[in-house]
Amino acid sequence: MAEITASLVKELRERTGAGMMDCKKALTEANGDIELAIENMRKSGAIKAAKKAGNVAADGVIKTKIDGNYGIILEVNCQTDFVAKDAGFQAFADKVLDAAVAGKITDVEVLKAQFEEERVALVAKIGENINIRRVAALEGDVLGSYQHGARIGVLVAAKGADEELVKHIAMHVAASKPEFIKPEDVSAEVVEKEYQVQLDIAMQSGKPKEIAEKMVEGRMKKFTGEVSLTGQPFVMEPSKTVGQLLKEHNAEVTGFIRFEVGEGIEKVETDFAAEVAAMSKQS
């Protein structure tokens, strides 16, 4: 067995753009033959995947699955809406989802490691970067889910509710984006931040501080209702709040998770004309 030196790994990284561990593995399998390692990496798609790794994957799918009292929600990203609809990409996301449910895996790094070889092969086949971005689990007496297309997914856990009610609550969460279950759940940090914003607005209107503070107190009650599930008007019957709906059914929501594709990812918009102009200057 040839010695796999650091300089050899470094050279392979520079020539392929692949990660250090991938290069070391390829060299070990090729018994230190760098040309054979490169050939094997090309065949496996590792080089193509490495080149795509820097591309922003902000599109993709949200998947949900419930098994009894346990549910998983998963986001898998690609670069375009076209690939998000690809059968191979969808099958890959479903396979990751099934594994997460079966193994109750909530550590995304574990999923990434488990499916890295399949991901690399899919990147080579499809030609876009693919990323298993996040996964979360929810447990409860009654679970419900809702998918708005493939871009928004929701899991809801409740007590004392039937499946239809939980489904309707999940639809509401998808549409209204609550951040907390009840107004009293809104964190002190969020309340303080909003209070300062509203106080600044009130003070700018020229009101005395005492009057401004009273105005803000009223606004804060409205704010905590707006960002909490039970304080929001129910989307299917806006004359009542979700809290009132739950009370009518003697039910309680114990948790919810809402994922939307690409949340928090800054998608780079390419100016094609500018890109061509820049390339022409380099040539």
From Swiss-Prot:
Phenotype when changing residue 148 to A: At least 100-fold decrease in affinity between EF-Ts and EF-Tu and only small amount of GDP exchange activity
GO molecular function: guanyl-nucleotide exchange factor activity; translation elongation factor activity; zinc ion binding
PROSITE patterns listed in its UniProt record: EF_TS_1, EF_TS_2
GO biological process, one term: translational elongation
Region (Involved in Mg(2+) ion dislocation from EF-Tu): 80-83
Broad class of where this protein is predominantly found: cytoplasm
GO-annotated cellular components: cytoplasm; cytosol; guanyl-nucleotide exchange factor complex; membrane
Stated consequence of mutating residue 82 to A: 2 to 3-fold less active in promoting GDP exchange and 6-fold less active in binding to EF-Tu
Keyword line: Cytoplasm, Elongation factor, Protein biosynthesis
Annotated consequence of substituting residue 81 to A: 2 to 3-fold less active in promoting GDP exchange and slightly lower binding constant for interaction with EF-Tu
Compartment list: Cytoplasm
S-adenosyl-L-methionine listed as a keyword: no
InterPro entries: EF-Ts_dimer_sf, Transl_elong_EFTs/EF1B, Transl_elong_EFTs/EF1B_dimer, Transl_elong_Ts_CS, UBA-like_sf
Pfam families: EF_TS
Keyword Protein biosynthesis belongs to the record: yes
Record's miscellaneous remark: In order to produce high amounts of bacteriophage Qbeta RNA polymerase catalytic core, a fusion protein consisting of tsf-tufB-replicase with a cleavable linker between tufB and the viral replicase subunit is frequently used.
Function: Associates with the EF-Tu.GDP complex and induces the exchange of GDP to GTP. It remains bound to the aminoacyl-tRNA.EF-Tu.GTP complex up to the GTP hydrolysis stage on the ribosome. (Microbial infection) In case of infection by bacteriophage Qbeta (and related Leviviruses), part of the viral RNA-dependent RNA polymerase complex. With EF-Tu may provide a stabilizing scaffold for the beta (catalytic) subunit, implicated in the elongation step of viral RNA synthesis where it fixes EF-Tu in an open conformation.
Known partners and oligomeric status: Heterotetramer composed of two EF-Ts.EF-Tu dimer complexes.
Similarity section: Belongs to the EF-Ts family.
Protein name as catalogued: Elongation factor Ts
Biological classification of the source: Bacteria, Pseudomonadati, Pseudomonadota, Gammaproteobacteria, Enterobacterales
Gene that encodes the chain: tsf
